[in-house]
Swiss-Prot record:
Binding site for Mg(2+) 1: 191, 195
An example Gene Ontology CC term for this record: cytosol
Enzyme class, spelled out: oxidoreductase
Binding site for substrate: 252
Keyword terms, alphabetized: Amino-acid biosynthesis, Branched-chain amino acid biosynthesis, Magnesium, Metal-binding, NADP, Oxidoreductase
Entry function: Involved in the biosynthesis of branched-chain amino acids (BCAA). Catalyzes an alkyl-migration followed by a ketol-acid reduction of (S)-2-acetolactate (S2AL) to yield (R)-2,3-dihydroxy-isovalerate. In the isomerase reaction, S2AL is rearranged via a Mg-dependent methyl migration to produce 3-hydroxy-3-methyl-2-ketobutyrate (HMKB). In the reductase reaction, this 2-ketoacid undergoes a metal-dependent reduction by NADPH to yield (R)-2,3-dihydroxy-isovalerate.
Designated name of the protein: Ketol-acid reductoisomerase (NADP(+))
Domain KARI C-terminal knotted residue range list: 183-328
EC assignment: 1.1.1.86
Sequence ranges assigned to domain KARI N-terminal Rossmann in this UniProt record: 1-182
Length: 339
């Protein structure tokens, strides 16, 4: 596995080019601001008409243009609008204005891997994917650090696709931590699996089930919140810092023993069998097709599930308890008024 660091990338390449960041959400705001702070002078944010993000981007000192105008102007287009919106936006606002030698970049391989976007052969197509949310990418950059990232080349029409992609990755801070060379397929499938089975789907359902079990047994919701949600960060921080063994070194023997005897009762062979089915749905395109169809119908199921989750009792309890933790409100990663 090839890993690139600061010395492997020439930041002057991206500094000489005209760069448009399409979208200004979690990833878009971090990419645009990190590029700007890294000396990329010719940078614009491309947004659709009426976008609520326009004021945020302009307040940050960034020039905002239409997506079509960005496609005509830029040498490098980083497409960071939500996955479900990219294909239509590309077909209507980007593809008609492309010229030979331009460089299309993506922060996630979803649309390329599942052939929802099929770029013409005379443009470069690459991936520069930070391994973390945009708010964390920006925070780490400002602290002088960086997030690990991934790089992949789908098309190299000019012969310089990799050099430019590495230069871009350096400008957003990824080479400070290391950039791993991969493929669009590998990035897409592992990313989706990690999100669904572990990081978002798995953890959230485990937290909810634990909380509900304690509350239904008569324990105070506040105690259930602390034990099943709040302390998750404390444990994950230890794992993040030095692995599972590092976490086990820090916790009590009682907690460690409980990990060994109880963990396998909850996550067992049946769980792993279901995980393999989840991976198969990702690999064969079932998940992608379902997500595309959901959005073509206006995403009614998605919005209903989002509403149910935001209305879960753990959210109300958490909001009340977090209001008591003033120290936890300092240096917030997410400030919805700015990013």
């Amino acid at each position: 596995m090839k890993i690139y660091y600061e010395k492997d990338a020439d930041i002057s390449l991206i500094q000489k080019l005209k760069v448009a960041v399409v979208g200004y959400g979690s990833q878009g705001h971090a990419h645009a601001l990190n590029l700007k702070d890294s000396g990329v002078k010719q940078i614009k944010v491309a947004l659709q008409e009426g976008s609520a993000s326009r004021k945020k981007a302009e307040a940050a000192g960034l020039e905002v243009v239409s997506v079509a105008d960005a496609a005509k102007w830029a040498d490098v287009l980083m497409i960071l609008v939500p996955d479900e919106k990219q294909a239509v936006l590309y077909a209507n606002e980007i593809e008609p204005h492309l010229r030979a030698g331009q460089h299309l970049m993506f922060g996630h391989g979803f649309n390329i891997h599942y052939n929802l976007i099929r770029p013409r052969a005379d443009v470069d197509v690459s991936l520069s994917a930070p391994k973390g949310p945009g708010h964390t990418l920006r925070n780490q950059y400002q602290m002088g650090f960086g997030l690990p990232g991934l790089i992949a080349i789908h098309q190299d029409a000019t012969g310089s696709a990799q050099a430019v992609a590495l230069s871009y990755s350096k400008a957003i801070g990824n080479t400070r931590a290391g950039v791993i060379e991969t493929s669009f397929r590998e990035e897409t499938e592992t990313d989706l699996f990690g999100e669904q089975a572990v990081l978002c789907g798995g953890i959230v359902e485990l937290i909810k089930a634990g909380y509900e079990t304690l509350v239904e047994a008569g324990y105070a919701p506040e105690m259930a919140y602390f034990e099943c949600l709040h302390e998750t960060k404390l444990i994950v921080d230890l794992i993040y810092e030095g692995g599972i063994a590092n976490m086990n070194y820090s916790i009590s023997n009682t907690a460690e023993y409980g990990e060994y005897v109880t963990g396998p009762r909850l996550v067992n062979a049946e769980t792993k069998k279901e995980m393999k089915k989840v991976l198969e749905d990702i690999q064969n395109g079932t998940f992608a097709r379902n997500w595309v169809l959901e959005n073509q119908a206006g995403a009614p199921g998605f919005h209903a599930m989002r509403q149910r989750m935001s209305s879960h009792p753990i959210e109300e309890v958490g909001e009340k308890l977090r209001g008591m933790m003033h120290w936890a409100q300092n240096d917030r990663l997410v400030d919805k008024s700015r990013n």
